[in-house]
Curated annotation (Swiss-Prot):
Keywords: DNA damage, DNA repair. One of its GO terms (biological process) is mismatch repair. Residues 356-371 have a biased composition (Basic and acidic residues). InterPro entries: DNA_mismatch_repair_CS, DNA_mismatch_repair_MutL, DNA_mismatch_S5_2-like, HATPase_C_sf, MutL/Mlh/PMS, MutL/Mlh/Pms-like, MutL_C, MutL_C_dimsub. One of its GO terms (cellular component) is mismatch repair complex. The keyword DNA repair applies. One of its GO terms (molecular function) is ATP binding. This is DNA mismatch repair protein MutL.
Length: 669
């Protein structure tokens, strides 16, 4: 008797579910994708105990026909594919017909659905089998309830992480779906608490404001670009909002969230020298393309894809991010809280005195405050919850304008309690600002950007409010300032009417010299200085093999290395722009770069050499300068293409506004 036999359907479905349904967030992802594919404009996701107890997804999509209900929980039953060639023209998020079969094999599922001009139906499925099918009252669309996930696979349930971690995974998936489909109203509710609620306006920047907060949303820069095969659209946050991991990079292809090493690399190259090592940007990029150029059927969860013409897409992303930040003022803010312009400035002890009873009254009413630091401590991305939000009187409020500044008026005794009802003006202002941002992003006219930033600067005494503008004269992105002095022989202190500036002198000169060396290394020049006595270098046999392989690359950066017999090589000339007292050391360092990497392209070699030389030749810490030297250094920095970060991505200049300084000394309450 043969040993091979066909598995029972229920067992096969449990095995298949291992790939499709890894955790509660997998269920949310599959059901959310089905709702979007059904044409829903409103989707509600409700979870209890992070989805382990129940997950409910309700949409107003097309619904499921009564005659299709018998097949909906069968494996490989789908309405999205019909023949082989359809697999190469996929525009839906789902297409395999595995999701509902896999979910129903490891959970108890109740599905209610109704189509146009039809009666509703309800079916109950357990262990992959339909146990009940009956007519039911239902609105147009689909209402699916998944309960007792992994009830019949206890081993899987055992490896579920903490409820907090699982909720983070769910929130992450819903957030990304909301970003890629801003035209759909999406709500996520956990144990009765709203975690996310979007308005379906079609504006991605509004969704990002809901997820990351208005502080980040105001610093988003719109990008857009085309090639013959690709169109990209998205938002990239300014470098000061960088994070410690890649989790905040969101890439979509035709609305589908994907992970791709090369596209991540393209984004980081677009931010080149603007981010320090180990820091990653907040960004959203959607790539529209013909489905035939992408294979989405290479990964169980469709997270990884294979792309045609990947290099073309890579260069498009790099160039558009670089263009987004070119000529923009990117002076980072310090970590002090912001203070609205109209708050009281106290000049005497009597003015600063606040009665204890009044303070206690205010504190009792301000029970909860919203803090971006608290949000960032959470493992998931939702930062802007629907809790009652109370703004402290001295906290930064980006929506305070001349028409709503009374919300934090000077009358401290009023004990203003900022509830939802009294917050109508606040959220109205939020909507207006987002709409203005959207109009700005839709325009390629630099004037519209300037107008938006000028409006912001009307409400705050803060030079950073205009830091996102595109300067008409790129060499004037560093504001004029008066040199005050130097701290610890390392930081230059300067001031102007906007406040105080601190400039890292080493980082500033490193940027200046980096751009000089980068341009020189890239030049094809015959300006060579001959050496009276050639420099001799000795290498081991395995080092020789690497050097011989990359001799052409060395020549392209000006190093003419010649074999001199045995393990010896000589250099008899060098480019005239090499610092004369460090020629041998520089050549050694260049060769060591190649020996360490063992795989070097000319672009990376030039980059590494420019960074290395600029770092070696720049002013070090504890080096005291004369005032005219400080002034000359800042003037040279103004001429730089990217004067805000050193080649390693560290900030060069930081601004403390006048009001921030006053707050530090308690002159503003």
């Amino acid at each position: 008797m043969g040993k091979i036999k066909e598995l029972q359907t229920s067992l096969a479905n449990k095995i298949a579910a291992g790939e499709v349904v890894e955790r509660p967030s997998s269920v949310v992802k599959e059901l959310l994708e089905n709702a979007i594919d059904a044409g829903a404009t409103e989707i509600s996701i409700e979870v209890e105990e992070s989805g382990v107890q129940s997950i409910r997804v309700v949409d107003n999509g097309s619904g499921i026909e009564a005659e299709d209900l018998g097949l909906v929980f069968h494996r490989h039953a789908t309405s999205k594919l019909d023949q082989d060639e359809d697999l190469f023209h996929i525009r839906t998020l789902g297409f395999r017909g595995e999701a509902l079969a896999s979910i129903s094999s490891v959970a108890k599922v109740t599905l209610k659905t109704c189509t146009d001009n039809a009666n509703g139906n309800e079916i109950y499925v357990e262990n992959g089998e339909i146990l009940n099918h009956k007519p039911a009252k239902a609105k147009k669309g689909t209402d699916i309830l998944v309960e007792s996930l992994f009830y019949n696979t206890p081993a899987r349930l055992k490896y579920i992480k903490s409820l907090y971690t699982e909720l983070g995974k769910i929130t992450d998936i819903v957030n990304r779906m909301a970003m890629s489909h801003p035209d759909i109203r999406i709500a996520l509710i956990s144990d009765g608490k709203t975690m996310l609620s979007t308005n379906g306006s079609g504006r991605t920047n509004e969704v990002m404001a809901e997820i990351y907060g208005m502080k980040v949303a105001r610093d988003l820069v719109h990008i857009s670009g085309d090639t013959s095969d690709y169109h990209i659209e998205g938002f990239v946050a300014k470098p000061e909002h960088s994070r410690s991991n890649k989790h905040y990079i969101s890439i979509f292809i035709n609305g589908r969230y994907i992970k791709n090493f090369m596209l991540n690399k393209a984004i980081l190259e677009g931010y080149h020298t603007l981010l320090t090592i180990g820091r990653f940007p907040i960004c959203y990029i959607n790539i529209e393309m013909d489905p035939i150029l992408v294979d989405v059927n290479v990964h169980p969860t469709k997270l990884e894809v294979r792309l045609s013409k990947e290099e073309q897409l890579y260069q498009l992303i790099v160039s558009k991010i670089q263009e987004a930040f070119k000529d923009r003022i990117l002076i980072p803010k310090n970590n002090l809280d912001y203070v609205p312009k109209k708050n009281k400035v106290l000049h005497s002890f009597e003015q600063q005195k606040i009665e204890f009873e009044q303070r206690q009254n205010t504190e009792n009413k301000q029970e909860k405050t919203f803090s971006s630091e608290e949000s960032n401590s959470k493992p998931f991305m939702a930062e802007n919850q629907n809790d009652e939000i109370v703004i402290k009187e001295d906290s930064y409020n980006p929506f305070v304008t001349k028409t709503s500044e009374s919300l934090i008026a000077d009358d401290e005794s009023s004990g203003y309690n900022n509830t939802r009802e009294k917050d109508e003006d606040y959220f109205k202002k939020q909507q207006e600002i987002l709409q203005e941002m959207d109009q700005t992003f839709d325009s390629n006219d630099d004037t519209s950007v300037q107008n938006y930033e000028n409006k912001a600067s009307d409400d705050y005494y803060d030079v950073n409010d205009i830091k996102g503008t595109k300067s008409k004269d790129p060499k004037r992105r560093i504001p004029y300032m008066e040199i005050v002095g130097q701290v610890h022989g390392t930081y230059i202190i300067a001031q102007n009417e906007f406040g105080m500036y601190m400039i890292d002198q080493h980082a500033a000169q490193e940027r200046i010299k980096y751009e000089y060396f980068r341009d020189k290394i890239g030049e094809v020049t015959n300006e060579i200085q001959d050496l009276l006595i050639p420099l001799t270098f000795h290498f081991s046999k395995d080092e020789q093999l690497v050097i011989d392989q990359y001799k052409n690359e060395l020549q392209q950066v000006g190093i003419m290395l010649e074999h001199f017999g045995g393990h010896d090589y000589i250099v008899s000339s060098y480019p005239v722009w090499f610092p004369k007292d460090e020629v041998e050391e520089i050549i050694k360092d260049m060769i060591e770069l190649i020996l360490e990497e063992k795989k070097v392209d000319i672009k990376k070699l030039r980059e590494d050499v420019a960074i290395m030389m600029s770092c070696k030749k720049s002013i070090k810490a504890n080096h005291y300068l004369q005032k005219h030297e400080m002034s000359d250094l800042i003037d040279q920095l103004r001429e730089a293409e990217d004067p805000f970060t050193c080649p390693h991505g560290r900030p060069i200049i930081i601004n403390f506004s006048k009001y921030e300084l006053e707050k530090l000394f308690k002159r503003v309450m």
